[in-house]
Amino acid sequence: MSKAKTLYEKIYDAHVVVAAPGETPILYIDRHLVHEVTSPQAFDGLREKGRPVRQVSKTFATMDHNVSTTTKDINASGEMARIQMQTLSKNCEEFGVTLYDINHKYQGIVHVMGPELGITLPGMTIVCGDSHTATHGAFGSLAFGIGTSEVEHVLATQTLKQGRAKTMKIEVRGKVAPGITAKDIVLAIIGKTTAAGGTGYVVEFCGEAIRDLSMEGRMTVCNMAIELGAKAGLIAPDATTFNYIKGRKFAPQGSDWDAAVDYWQTLKTDEDAQFDAVVTLEASEIKPQVTWGTNPGQVIAVDEPIPSPSQFADPVERSSAEKALAYMGLEAGKMLSDYKVDKVFVGSCTNSRIEDMRAAAAVAKGKKVASHVQALIVPGSEQVKAQAEAEGLDKIFIEAGFEWRLPGCSMCLAMNNDRLGPGERCASTSNRNFEGRQGRDGRTHLVSPAMAAAAAIAGHFVDIRQF
């Protein structure tokens, strides 16, 4: 009888090309996603050494990090952005790599574009020079971010040195209450594990609340696996996964489809497989979440008071809480709803898919954005934008006073003109609330799309359950 394995171990073992004694194993990489920010030096390295891209058919590029969301002009986000986008175009042309550039109908945030085109498939290894590559783990693929030198290594060899990680199971038992979203689930998880609780692990998310999620919701959860310190996040594929993939541009077809599904159905953790760590949450206890601090683990339910540093027994956590409250301009004991928001951002690789647009539009319909708030809706791709417009969501947003923008990473990381001014407070559907992430001295609160839209209308945080 062979040893019982976790889903992670099954995918990892199936991709080991070379495992020399005493050496880090070399894994085969099935898909390599490329964007304009972390690829220029990698292509330069190939050029210097006279190497081609080994597998152009497994390499896909797009522009997302610093594209403007107001115009398709590559000059709009400044000199550095223009150079990076022009360099990507030149590199993809020279090396024969597929590029969905700023004017292409498939352009979008790399972690939105890959899944919606069927590039992302269960059981694959997927890498990208971007920390939120974990998103693709929602399909039961092993997906993780890599550095620029590793980008060059994958371009040249289609392989990567990768040691075996520890495994963690995060089970969300039972069903969530009405109005609770995937974003609330994952923020509650990070609140429990802390922002470093998953360090050194690949996490598998499971339980009824996870199985109940759509693919969009599962992508939101896996996207933020990195925010609890994990290397990657995985969810076992099931009928929801297969229904989402079927018929997409790069999905298998005909008899290949049947064979693929047969294989994908084996991609689950064996019953008696052992995890190195197990974390359990009760879904019914999860409320709408809002971060109050400067890492995603500093999070509370919207109906809880802002915590006092004295509540933290660990001196490091206490000091971190003190610093976070000072930076965020918050007072312990008050409610987050006591503070007005200046900007609202619905978008990013965490929450910019069609389901997220629909959730925000359902809240916005027939209402008006508060007069002091600037609210941006940034679809994750041209495909999402077209779908939203076909459903009339853009009109709902514009009528309510939201700005309907072009696709890109936008205000998640302020590499274009979408950013916070010093001291501005933002309700954001993105994944990182670090100091300065959305602009120097900006104050970021992470929330779900519905919570963000409600904050835009009320002018401050509200409990979506009472909105």
From Swiss-Prot:
Keywords: 4Fe-4S, Amino-acid biosynthesis, Branched-chain amino acid biosynthesis, Iron, Iron-sulfur, Leucine biosynthesis, Lyase, Metal-binding. Its EC number is 4.2.1.33. One of its GO terms (molecular function) is 4 iron, 4 sulfur cluster binding. Its cofactor is [4Fe-4S] cluster. Binds 1 [4Fe-4S] cluster per subunit. InterPro entries: 3-IsopropMal_deHydase_lsu, Acnase/IPM_dHydase_lsu_aba_1/3, Acoase/IPM_deHydtase_lsu_aba, Aconitase_4Fe-4S_BS, Aconitase_4Fe-4S_dom, IPM_dehydratase_rel_enz, IPMI_cat. GO terms for biological process: L-leucine biosynthetic process. [4Fe-4S] cluster binds at residues 349, 409, 412. CDD domains: IPMI (cd01583). It catalyses: (2R,3S)-3-isopropylmalate = (2S)-2-isopropylmalate. Pathway: Amino-acid biosynthesis; L-leucine biosynthesis; L-leucine from 3-methyl-2-oxobutanoate: step 2/4. Coiled coil: none annotated. Heterodimer of LeuC and LeuD. Belongs to the aconitase/IPM isomerase family. LeuC type 1 subfamily. PANTHER family: 3-ISOPROPYLMALATE DEHYDRATASE (PTHR43822:SF9), HOMOACONITASE, MITOCHONDRIAL-RELATED (PTHR43822). Catalyzes the isomerization between 2-isopropylmalate and 3-isopropylmalate, via the formation of 2-isopropylmaleate. This is 3-isopropylmalate dehydratase large subunit. It comes from Vibrio cholerae serotype O1 (strain ATCC 39315 / El Tor Inaba N16961). The gene is leuC.
